[in-house]
């Protein structure tokens, strides 16, 4: 019963998502890292029209489709998703960001994090990566 009310308040940060799409077009990689459940992350991304990672450009195990032209993901897709269940210690511990970096094969020096919550900002700071504070 909470989802319809919650989804009414969820809005895409257009400037941030434009940056992410341009970054991906230039060979950058974009991940969603959240302490939320994978089901909640998937539901929010579907609501916003953002697709998740796929194998060979098909449908991922979560049902997301790849590609900007796919009607199921009209705004494009991300390269990876990490949920709270993927790490032992949630934010403000840096584990979620460090695990995403490990999976992507990059270092904190090669990583840029965008965060909107106090605990997320603390986790980003503790990860050693550069970060921006996003106001929603």
Please annotate each region the language model reported.
Residues 1-28:
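Metal-dependent phosphoesterase signature
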Residues 10-14, 91, 115:
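Conserved phosphate-coordination/catalytic loops
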Residues 23, 104, 131-134:
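Alpha-helix C-terminal capping segments
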Residues 29, 130:
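Residue-level detector of anion-binding/catalytic polar loops
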Residues 31, 37-112, 118-126:
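Substrate-recognition "cap/lid" segment bordering the active-site pocket of phosphatases
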Residues 117-120, 131-136:
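Short glycine/proline-centered loop/turn elements that form peptide/ligand docking sites
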